[in-house]
Amino acid sequence: MKPFLSRSKTESDDKDEYNPIEDLVQTVKTIMEHFFTPEQYKELFGTASEGLHRSLTKYKNRKDGAQFLKAVEDFNQIMRKQKSLGAIQEHVRQYGHRLPYDLVVHLLQQVYSRTVAARASKLNQYEAFSNNVYGEILPILTKEFIQRTKMDESKVFVDLGCGIGNVVLQVALQTGAESYGVEIMDTPAKFAKKQAREFEARTRAFGLNHGAVSMIHGDFLDTPGLAGILARADVVLVNNYAFNSALNQSLLQLFLDLKEGCKIISLKTFVSLDHKINVRNAGSVESILRVKKYPYYTNAVSWTHNGGEYFIATVDRSAVQAFWERAMSDGGASLDDGGSRRSSTRRR
């Protein structure tokens, strides 16, 4: 690991500008915390108040380049020895596909800073109030999606309208799931592919496992091969916060062939929370979806600091089947009054 000195910064510089020195310090901290046991950390690097990371931070703050470089070389020597002993590889191997969240976020931030950050302003070039408005779901909310849907390495995940692919990469790395992203807009789609390439190289350098990643540039309503992928999907994400009703209705038709138990995460619901099955709507896609609403809190999405809500709809055809079985058992008498039956589950 070799630092390079950034240009001198003034007080007016953008605070969000990539800082390689800060990145190096945070990378060292991440490696110490997640590639070694607590006992190894203390033995090899010292304590948090007096150890090597403290030295790096101190010399960075003092702008003492010579001592900073010496601390980096001390770290590199330790790493070379531990790598030769196989200690690092052994510890990382124990994670399998259950990587710590902080490690995942740091690696994704490194990928972003090397592929997107310098050109991020291009992402704002879209038609306002259209279906192609750009916005990203942030890692903390993606983490919640993963927990709610119980994603793991046996699952298939599809992000319809994936933007620059951040969620796809996080799911692949944090869970090991086979992960797909589809994006229609040229600029985000190009960034998604660049991120995927950098992600592959960086995870390989760190020795980390991840699920297969595929970024597709195309319209999710008309992408060859997507129907086959969706038929295998266990979790589908649709950031439909800015979609109009026509596009949401078109999306519903894609969901008709999803397998039983597939979960659809969306920022706007595709079906009313009090949807009732009756003779008129029993054949609709809405009637096979069992939906629940969840809150999200501050700093969970890129387009607002405020909280909001999201929905998880589960494909469940049992309510429709029960409706028709009931109708057949009484010769259709129960349909005379509309024969409605509430399809969503109530929280207890």
Regions found by a protein language model. Name each.
Residues 1-154:
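S-adenosyl-L-methionine
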Residues 153-163:
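Conserved class I S-adenosyl-L-methionine
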Residues 165-169:
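Glycine-rich SAM-binding Motif I of class I
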Residues 188-348:
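Domain-level detector for long C-terminal conserved domains
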